[in-house]
């Protein structure tokens, strides 16, 4: 059981509210745009007020030539017009002067307030406002003419040409005939149904008394000249007065615009019936204003927008809070079973009490989505995902195929790895409950294969027939687990277990990537100057020119070398020239290219760093948002292409991707079907049940831990999980691969989560200051299916794939492993061990759990991780599956060390522990109560995840 916002461990890691049901166009409302702005799922069900675009027009040029100029605009945040630069400022949190709010309140209390005005045009609106003022007919006419004067808007183009004043300020009439998208790029980023509000402020010499008016239109109308965007206007505010107060009218205009941009004030004023309601809303705003001491803050500084918006829940009236609290609680419980600890299991984990009942329910749930699983893949983003995952899958197949060939002495190899990956993966994508899962060989299963082969060799057993019976028993055991709905045990896989497993395999992944590079350097050694071990000489036939004389000579420097009869330093005579002249190149480095090792390291780290940089550029300030999105989505693909291009340009003989070119088993003399017994005795088919039991535990733990991670509700998957169906498919494929002598396959967490990461949907357009909204994952079956089909035909793509350097693929593997390890919450707690207390970030966890207890919990996890690594690396690796089960047992034992409240924050609660926590528990109570605790805002925000790329 997790707490809201605990998923990323830091209090700031709760993401903005995003609606998964929004269309992928990105034009749907973002955080705070439905209902009172800033309200999320539960609150938006109570009210759906449209987004309000507020524009401040200021009267400038007194006393010479009066004109209205746009000087500010608001959506979520304020944008000021920098007059000198002729451009809009970056969106920032507005700061107000308290006297301006007080003067605004006084002006509105004594001025004109028209609620539900029936005006149908700007002229009618101005007439109603002016008629309410006690002015002479002449002044009334002047005021009316002034208010009808067309303002000058600043429409910033997307070009790089410097703006002159004549271009920066354009008359609205000049753009009336231009297409809307060319008039204002901001218009494209507003959701459908957005409305406008105009605030007019300034000094007017012929006025003797301040003039204030606030108008709410019953039916919004387009007051075209007043705002830069052609939107129906709902509110109109006028603040004018004699030129005696300096910039006070400008600040009052800003105050009015900020009020209208405030969610709670806007919600209240939309429902106000009389002037007291309007003033009460303003007073409520004043009660929540935070003042900054003048001597501790630069008033000209602009506060950047927060990364994540706080919830507006507790700012609304008590009755609305009660309704939204219930609605929010219901939505929150549905949002993430891990975050909010539901008291009833999710549908996929409800016990039916019938044989294969869970499997039947999974099939029924997934059948209705089957057609859309293919139609939803018709999107350009899926092409990037296919290319990225295909290269990762092919590299993984080659890597594990080579390792498996070494471990089994050629009984299985790269060809079996390709064939098994293609057939098993494609079948799984077609029939699985979670088609986003990518099947692959995994490290723990490879360890078991190595041990099984060693056992067969030591006892002179026929390996493949023995392995066949192990696979048959594993299939039987897994089918029994499916029949008895054993997948319900995943409720006991808390974050403690998941992090231990993911951290272990992440380290294995990083270790293997680095190990492969070290092996490559050994194969292509670095030639250090002056090293006799890497010499290369040209030997000529004749007297004294023989090998014994060369090897026995005491060569201490270049002169000694050149004085040996018949020998010439190869630095002066390359091996090809030596051969042409009748000599013979002699020495260990005659056929070694000295640049291979260093250049391979360059490709390795270039692809690794490029993938990280391009992934992070998606959330940077560089380039337009469309370019950033493309670079982020294609980060790994671009890193691979960059490495290939660099390798091709320099033309060095780096090791390339090797793909089998012949379709036949690696072990000569055997057919594709494995004989049931071979040379083994019959009773071995029964004895195989014992290792099969251990392998079944490993398969179950590996598959279901991956499934739990993949199906976390914060990923906003809409089509549900299929724990029972996935395990059933893996069990059937175990029988198939065992019969053909192919590798065993299970869910590969690293590639599966990389698959999800490549398919994440975000809003395409965001209003200024708003981060892109996480909309969910593009759930479909086609990308995985195409990946595995391409893997199967890769034998015929060898002429193309042979140009991909292996160091580049090792760099991508390192990237996935590092990204996985850095995203695990456990690693962030390990970092606390190295931080002085005063430098530790402000985390919710540290507010509720003593630091010593946090360190103790982290130390226990480190000890478990070290134990798993030792067991994996020793002959005792046969008990590795039991050690994974041991993680669950250790987590259960932690109940004797930590209190339920501490475990609630440090980890998740097991089903039995949830019953020990009362409904009115003190810590999580503020999640739904709407109280005023300092944590409630931070804990209240739902999580839109940065996909955690774990490992396989």
Swiss-Prot record:
The effect of disrupting this gene, in the record's words, is: Homozygous mice lacking the Slc4a9 gene have no obvious phenotypical abnormalities.
Q: Does the keyword Methyltransferase apply?
A: no
Gene3D superfamilies of this UniProt entry?
Answer: Helical hairpin bin, Mannitol-specific EII, Chain A
Cell location = Basolateral cell membrane
The reaction(s) this protein catalyses: 2 hydrogencarbonate(out) + chloride(in) + Na(+)(out) = 2 hydrogencarbonate(in) + chloride(out) + Na(+)(in); K(+)(in) + 2 hydrogencarbonate(in) + chloride(out) = K(+)(out) + 2 hydrogencarbonate(out) + chloride(in); Li(+)(in) + 2 hydrogencarbonate(in) + chloride(out) = Li(+)(out) + 2 hydrogencarbonate(out) + chloride(in); Rb(+)(in) + 2 hydrogencarbonate(in) + chloride(out) = Rb(+)(out) + 2 hydrogencarbonate(out) + chloride(in)
Residues with glycosylation annotation: 546, 569, 920, 931, 948
Summarizing activity control, the record says: Cl(-)/HCO3(-) exchanger activity is substantially increased in response to 5 uM isoproterenol. Cl(-)/HCO3(-) exchanger activity is increased by both forskolin and coexpression with the catalytic subunit alpha of PKA.
Q: Where are the transmembrane segments?
A: 385-405, 413-433, 470-490, 501-521, 593-613, 634-654, 681-701, 727-747, 784-804, 807-827, 870-890
An annotated GO cellular component: membrane
An example Gene Ontology molecular-function term:
sodium:bicarbonate symporter activity
Tell me which tissues or organs this protein is expressed in: Expressed in submandibular gland (SMG) duct and cortical collecting duct (CCD) of kidney. Lower expressed in duodenal villi.
The protein's matches in InterPro entries, at most eight in alphabetical order, are given as: Band3_cytoplasmic_dom, HCO3_transpt-like_TM_dom, HCO3_transpt_euk, Na/HCO3_transpt, PTrfase/Anion_transptr
Task: Establish whether keyword Ion transport is in the entry.
Answer: yes
User: For bias kind Basic and acidic residues, which ranges apply?
Assistant: 12-22
Q: What are the boundaries of the region Disordered?
A: 1-41, 915-938
Which family does the similarity line name?
Belongs to the anion exchanger (TC 2.A.31) family.
Q: Which NCBIfam families match?
A: ae
Function according to Swiss-Prot or TrEMBL: Electroneutral Cl(-)/HCO3(-) antiporter that favors chloride ion entry and efflux of hydrogencarbonate and sodium ion across the basolateral membrane and may participate in salivary secretion. Also mediates Cl(-)/HCO3(-) exchange activity in the presence of K(+) as well as Cs(+), Li(+), and Rb(+). Does not contribute to Cl(-)/HCO3(-) exchanger in the apical membrane of the upper villous epithelium.
Q: Give the protein name, as stated in the record.
A: Anion exchange protein 4
Specify the species.
Mus musculus (Mouse)
GN (gene name)? Slc4a9
């Amino acid at each position: 059981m997790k707490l809201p916002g605990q998923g990323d461990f830091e209090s700031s890691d709760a993401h903005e509210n995003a609606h998964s049901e929004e269309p992928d166009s990105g034009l749907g409302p973002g955080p705070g745009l439905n209902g009172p702005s800033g309200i999320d799922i539960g609150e938006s069900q109570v009210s759906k007020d449209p987004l309000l675009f507020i524009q401040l027009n200021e009267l400038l040029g007194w006393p010479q030539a009066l004109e209205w100029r746009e000087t500010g605009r608001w959506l979520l945040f304020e944008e000021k017009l920098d007059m000198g630069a002729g451009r809009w400022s970056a969106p920032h949190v507005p700061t107000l002067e308290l006297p301006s709010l007080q003067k605004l309140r006084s002006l509105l209390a004594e001025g004109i307030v028209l609620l539900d005005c029936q005006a149908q045009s700007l002229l009618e609106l101005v007439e109603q406002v002016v008629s309410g003022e006690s002015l002479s007919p002449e002044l009334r006419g002047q005021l009316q003419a002034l208010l009808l004067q067309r303002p000058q808007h600043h429409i910033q183009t997307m070009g790089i040409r410097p703006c002159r004043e004549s271009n920066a300020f354009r008359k609205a009439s000049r753009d009336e005939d231009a297409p809307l998208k060319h008039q204002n790029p901001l218009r494209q980023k507003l959701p459908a149904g957005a409305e406008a509000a105009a605030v007019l402020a300034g000094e007017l010499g012929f006025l003797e008394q301040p003039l204030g008016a606030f108008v709410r239109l019953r039916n919004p109308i387009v007051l075209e000249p007043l705002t830069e965007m052609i939107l129906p206007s709902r509110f109109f505010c006028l603040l004018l007065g004699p030129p005696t107060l300096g910039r006070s009218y400008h600040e009052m205009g800003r105050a009015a615009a900020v009020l209208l941009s405030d969610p709670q004030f806007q919600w209240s004023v939309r429902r106000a019936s009389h002037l007291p309601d309007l003033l009460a809303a303003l007073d409520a705003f004043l009660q929540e204003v935070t003042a900054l001491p003048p001597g501790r803050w630069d008033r000209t500084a602009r506060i950047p927008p927060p990364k994540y918006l706080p919830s507006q829940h507790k700012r609304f009236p008590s009755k609305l809070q009660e309704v939204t609290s219930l609605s929010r609680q219901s939505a929150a419980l549905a949002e993430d079973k891990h975050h909010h600890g539901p008291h009833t299991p999710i549908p996929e984990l409800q016990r039916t009490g019938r044989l294969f009942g869970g499997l039947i329910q999974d099939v029924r749930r997934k059948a209705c989505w089957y057609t859309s699983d293919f139609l939803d893949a018709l999107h350009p983003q899926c092409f990037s995902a296919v290319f990225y995952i295909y290269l990762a899958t092919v590299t993984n197949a080659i890597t594990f195929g080579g390792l498996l060939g070494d471990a089994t002495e050629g009984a299985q190899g790269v060809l079996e790895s390709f064939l098994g990956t293609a057939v098993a993966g494609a079948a799984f994508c077609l029939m699985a409950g979670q088609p986003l899962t990518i099947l692959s060989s995994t490290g723990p299963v490879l360890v078991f294969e190595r041990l099984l082969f060693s056992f067969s060799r030591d006892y002179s057993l026929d390996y493949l027939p023995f392995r066949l019976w192990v696979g048959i028993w594993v299939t039987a055991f897994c089918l029994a687990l499916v029949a008895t709905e054993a997948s319900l045990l995943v409720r006991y896989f808390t974050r403690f277990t998941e992090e231990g497993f993911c951290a272990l395999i992440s380290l294995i992944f990083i270790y293997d990537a680095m190990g492969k590079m070290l092996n490559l350097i050994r194969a292509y050694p670095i030639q250090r100057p002056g090293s006799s071990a890497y010499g290369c000489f040209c030997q000529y036939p004749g007297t004294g020119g023989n090998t014994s004389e060369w090897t026995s000579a005491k060569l201490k420097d270049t002169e000694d070398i050149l004085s040996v009869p018949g020998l010439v330093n190869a630095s002066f005579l390359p091996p090809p020239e030596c051969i042409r002249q009748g000599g013979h190149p002699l020495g260990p480095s005659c056929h070694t290219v000295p640049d291979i090792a260093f250049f391979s390291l360059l490709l390795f780290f270039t692809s690794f760093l490029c993938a990280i940089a391009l992934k992070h550029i998606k959330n940077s300030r560089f380039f337009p948002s469309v370019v950033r999105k493309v670079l982020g989505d294609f980060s790994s693909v671009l890193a691979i292409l960059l490495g290939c291009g660099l390798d091709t340009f320099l033309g060095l003989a780096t090791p390339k991707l090797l793909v089998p070119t012949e379709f036949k088993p690696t072990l000569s003399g055997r057919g594709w079907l494995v004989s049931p017994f071979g040379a083994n005795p019959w009773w071995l088919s029964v004895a195989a049940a014992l290792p099969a039991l251990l392998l079944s535990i490993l398969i179950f733990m590996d598959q279901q831990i991956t499934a739990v991670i993949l199906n976390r509700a914060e990923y906003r998957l809409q089509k549900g999980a299929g724990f029972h169906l996935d395990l059933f498919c893996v069990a059937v494929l175990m029988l198939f691969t065992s019969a053909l002598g192919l590798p065993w396959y299970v869910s590969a967490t690293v590639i599966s989560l990389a698959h999800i990461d490549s398919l994440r949907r975000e809003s395409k357009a965001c209003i200024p200051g708003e981060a892109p909204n996480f909309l969910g994952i593009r759930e479909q079956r086609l990308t995985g299916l195409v990946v595995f089909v391409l893997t199967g035909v890769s034998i015929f793509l060898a002429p193309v794939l042979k140009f991909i350097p292996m160091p580049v693929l090792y760099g991508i593997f390192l990237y996935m492993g590092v990204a996985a390890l850095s995203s695990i919450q456990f690693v962030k707690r390990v970092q606390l061990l190295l931080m002085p207390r005063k430098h530790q970030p402000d985390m919710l966890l540290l507010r509720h759990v003593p630091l010593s207890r946090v360190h103790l919990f982290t130390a226990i996890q480190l000890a478990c991780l070290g134990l798993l690594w030792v067991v994996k690396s020793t002959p005792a690796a046969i008990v590795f599956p039991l050690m994974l089960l041991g993680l669950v047992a250790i987590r259960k034992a932690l109940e004797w060390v930590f209190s339920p409240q501490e475990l609630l924050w440090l980890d998740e609660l097991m089903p039995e522990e949830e019953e020990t926590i009362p409904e009115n528990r003190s810590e999580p109570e503020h999640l739904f109560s709407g109280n005023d605790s300092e944590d409630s805002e931070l804990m209240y925000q739902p999580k839109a995840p940065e996909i955690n790329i774990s490992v396989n």
